[in-house]
Amino acid sequence: MRSAEAPSDDSQPPQSLRALIGVIGAGIFVTGFGWPGIIGRLPFSLLLKNQLHMSADRVAVFWAIATLAWYVKPLAGFICDAYPLFGTRRRGYMLAGSALAGLFWLTFAVVPRGYASLVAVMTVLNIAMVFVSTVVGGLQVEVSQRYGATGRLASLRTGLEGVMNLLAGPVGGWLAVRAFGWTALSGSLVMLSFIPVVAWLDREPRGAPVNRQRASEVWSIARSHLGTIVRSRSMWGATGLLFLVYLAPGFQTPMLYYQQDVLKFDPRFMGFLQTLGGVGSIVGAALYGALCRKVPLRTSLIAGILLNAGSTLFYLRYESATSAALIDGAAGLVGTLATLPLYDLAARATPPGVESFGFSLMMSIRNVAIFVISDPLGSYLYSRHHVGFKQLVWLNAGSSAAVLLFLPVLPRALLAGREQSRAAG
């Protein structure tokens, strides 16, 4: 609800669609590529492993704690909606969040190389980035609805994610063999580059009021959305399936130790392997885009769960540079085909009227499964109980395949039909 003192948005000249798409595209890129888990995954993990001499489970716990803000991303959305910053609902958060994120990135260059100090700085960095990411996502939804640009913006996000995956490997590998200050500077420059884009292209008018009535309305909507979600059997069924699929003991961090300590891979080659996985993911996404119009979701889910378990078994032959390159590329392709049906299910299961909040809530629960449970559990078994890398592969594959037992819980109507048939209906 607009207050009487606030200027009407209708009196302002409409913003250019091209300019808004520029802001959205830049925002997606900087909050993705500039996230420490992308550009800084190798440099940070190898710093903790080789300089601070930490075990795999402590490295996994580091990432679990430091990415805490991403688990409660829906909360950031409600805060942004309820409390404008510098008289705007978007622009202020994007500018302030990017500036703070750039500053926190630079702090890594001077902060003492200790576990607690690194966790503290990365935690506040992630908080700043979550607010930027949340506002950019809200802007994407708003522009999609206002201009009928859902397809273009969805394609933009997918394309940029592909570019990020391709760049993250070689850039992360290059940074991992240089002084850590280069990583801090690189992350800072990525985040700070968003400031001139927002300042130049986003012409959101000032005057959004901070009033208790608006905040009360936003939190009332939040309670209503939560009530709708709690009553949705489809929503909780899909959320449970997502959680269980990603709950299997993971080996992301143990694989880094295995690559360095057993296979003696150079960090730059490890970055190259990430790039191959990114290429496979892009190809897999393109293939699923065609298959989802021809194959019912139930079939895709069953095949996806089996593919997820099967592609994991590729890593049993992860024994040389050549096999690693082939396996990472193939696993990226097959793994994407395996997981995209889960996101299709998540989108279908979200109750009408709470699409953005419901979907982000499911993704937050997925993140908890990956970062708080799966990777730390696998790393704990690897470090403390001396479970070998290949034993972890078997454990992960078996746990993933067992999720098939959960499928009968999902409503039949949710799994019926292809994407095209649902759209037609």
Roles of regions detected by a PLM:
Residues 3-18, 204-237:
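Juxtamembrane intracellular "pre-TM" segments in multi-pass secondary transporters
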